Design a protein with these regions (language model features):
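Cysteine-nucleophile active-site neighborhood
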Residues: 1-35
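Amide-donor transfer/coupling interface in amidating biosynthetic enzymes
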Residues: 31-160
Length: 160
């Protein structure tokens, strides 16, 4: 997600603190019409969840950008744009990271999430949120969850 935010900033777009955040999971990500056509989402189901951890979001896209997916928290979950000959694919979420790693990150940042970020009121809320993520682990399909990474790797093979 930070990579997309840096690319957007370098491309003269804008990133700001989000009104809400994803803590361990982004729910109900939906592809745009353009997203259905983009190679990053080849064979991907339209409505999906993914590991995510972010407090900031893209609010202004660089010129010639296309929003490929969104959800209720971030209107821009994935993008595509070009800078010269460079093709930029960006994701706000993390298909490359497991939910288990996200749970570890939540546990590691527990005090900050309660005291500083005020995302959770107490440890019980965190435990409930972790249980929610564990429910997702039980129903998610790893190959489907990581498909964007596979599609990106398959695509860059064509440039070598």
């Amino acid at each position: 997600c930070w990579g997309m935010q840096v690319a957007v900033t370098a491309g003269r777009g804008a990133v700001k603190k989000a009104a809400s955040s994803h803590i361990g999971i982004a729910n109900q990500i939906k592809m745009s019409v353009e997203g259905f056509k983009h190679p990053i989402y080849k064979n991907k189901k339209d409505n999906f969840n993914s590991p995510a951890f972010n407090f900031d979001e893209v609010v202004t896209l660089p010129k010639n950008s296309i929003c490929l997916a969104s959800n209720k928290i971030n209107k821009i979950q994935s993008i595509y744009f070009t800078v010269g000959d460079t093709k930029v694919w960006g994701l706000q979420y993390h298909p490359e990271i497991t939910y288990e790693k996200m749970i570890s990150l939540i546990e590691f940042r527990k005090k900050r999430l309660i005291d500083n970020r005020k995302v959770f009121k107490n440890e019980d809320e965190i435990k409930n949120h972790i249980a929610f993520i564990k429910d997702e682990i039980a129903v998610s399909n790893k190959s489907q969850r990581m498909l964007e990474l596979k599609n990106w790797l398959d695509n860059i093979k064509h440039y070598n």
